[in-house]
Each structure stands twice: as structure tokens, then as C-alpha cells.
Amino acid sequence: MKIPSIGYVFFLIFISITIVSSSPDHGEVEDETQFNYEKKGEKGPENWGRLKPEWAMCGKGNMQSPIDLTDKRVLIDHNLGYLRSQYLPSNATIKNRGHDIMMKFEGGNAGLGITINGTEYKLQQIHWHSPSEHTLNGKRFVLEEHMVHQSKDGRNAVVAFFYKLGKPDYFLLTLERYLKRITDTHESQEFVEMVHPRTFGFESKHYYRFIGSLTTPPCSENVIWTISKEMRTVTLKQLIMLRVTVHDQSNSNARPLQRKNERPVALYIPTWHSKLY
């Protein structure tokens, strides 16, 4: 539906109050062996909030992620603007965190990153979940990429992309030799030569925007989520590579869907595309 004036004002107020009143976020844990994704397991998603006091938000939070993105219930916003980035080449390290593969950029960032509501967020790391954690109109995809950014005052903003099976993903192709070394040697990390985030095609003309949480412990809230509506492709070989490399004998590292609790979700569409919705 097109965003009504009252709904639009409510969305802006909700975003502004949430960001201003929130405290700095706690980042994702580096060692993921302390929890797992077994549905009924003692360390599974249902019990994450009980494993450590600092992880309590995983069980009691009201703005948790992932969620289902339903086009029939979004507020269409033509004013957010294209999703653009300003990145610089940076050295990086690929690390096996226990349940996913993470690429961490040296110095904690790769250039300027992104700007949201006048605040700069620098790129900290990239990691992948399979299958996707968020769903689109109830549909789950084979892979979801998370680009985790952080502001100077410690607030998080995540940019995510969905993947379907198809042609090889160029960025993952450039990482294959490093992932193979981790798989063969069981080492926990590999240094990567100069990486330019621009190689994985960042810009998006349509995206969802909402406030949520980190999808792994400590599940910190007040995270600004930006999820591209435009689909990427990945081969089955690349998909298997990302799972085999972590050595956790699991075929999934996706947290179950969480309740929206009446949170507003905006969908940015350029004005010249508005007639399509």
C-alpha cells in the first residue's frame, strides 16, 4: 500500500525515538561455539536468553530479528533514497566463528561505509546465514548475507541481501581459495589480501527498513536493518562451501522468525517505480 501521511509520520517518529533513546549496542560474539541452532537443544535458539545474563535480550526482547517481510503490510516510502555506500579497499581476515564464516576488516572498517539519517556507519564485518533468516512474503531463500556496520557511538546497522540458486556470486568466487584452506587445515582464520567491498555490488533501488536486533547472541536491539529487495544468485557449490568450512556438522545457521510486535516496516521505492505497487 502507498504510505499514508499519518503512517509515514508515525514511522519517522518511531525510528527517531528508538535511535535517540537507545544505548550503544553490544556486538555479535566472536566465539559462536557457546550456542547452536538445534531447535530443541539446550543451547538452541529457544534457550539463548538463558545461557548467559548478557544474552537475556534473546529471550525477552520486543524488537528481535529476523522477521517476515510482508509487502501487504509495509509503508511505502519514496523519500529514503537509493542505498549507496562509500567504501575503500581494506585488508581483511576470514574467520570461522563456529557456526558461520565472517570476513572482518582490519582496523574495524573499510572506508566511510554508509550514512543513515545523517549518521555514518562503518563496515565492520560480513557473514552469511543459510538458509536465509528473514523471509519475504513467507518465502525463505537459500542464503542471506549480513554486512554489519557500526557508528562512532557503538550503534549497529546491518545491510542484508537474499540469494537464490543460479549463477556464481563473484565475491564468493574471490574467497574460494581462502575458504578451501580453512576447510582443509581446520584453521580458524585466513588473512585475505586487499578487499574492496565494491566488488559485491552494493547499490539497491528497492529495500526494506526497520528496527530490529542482532540475530545471534547477545541479540542486542535498536539495530537499523536495511534489506535489499533485489535478489542475488549463488551456486549450490558455493552454498555448500560456506557450510562445510565451519565444521559444525549442521546444515543450517538461521535463527527462527521472531514476532514483529507491531513494528513498522518501510519499503523504499523510487517515485518513478511507484505505479508498480
Swiss-Prot record:
Cofactor requirements of the protein: Zn(2+)
Active site (UniProt): H99
Binding site for substrate: T215, T216
Protein localization: Plastid, Chloroplast stroma
Disulphide-bonded residues: C58-C219
Keyword Chloroplast appears in the UniProt entry: yes
Main location: plastid
Pfam families membership: Carb_anhydrase
Keyword check for Endoplasmic reticulum: no
Binding of Zn(2+), residues: H127, H129, H146
SMART domains linked to this entry: Carb_anhydrase
Glycan attachment residues as annotated in the record: N91, N117
Alpha-carbonic anhydrase domain span: 33-269
GO CC terms of this entry: chloroplast stroma; stromal side of plastid thylakoid membrane
Post-translational modification: N-glycosylated.
Catalytic activity, as annotated: hydrogencarbonate + H(+) = CO2 + H2O
Alphabetized GO MF terms: carbonate dehydratase activity; zinc ion binding
Signal sequence residues: 1-22
PANTHER family reported in the protein's UniProt record: ALPHA CARBONIC ANHYDRASE 5-RELATED, CARBONIC ANHYDRASE
Family stated for the protein in its record: Belongs to the alpha-class carbonic anhydrase family.
Role noted for this protein: Reversible hydration of carbon dioxide.
Protein name (database record): Alpha carbonic anhydrase 5
Species assigned in the record: Arabidopsis thaliana
Origin organism lineage: Eukaryota, Viridiplantae, Streptophyta, Embryophyta, Tracheophyta
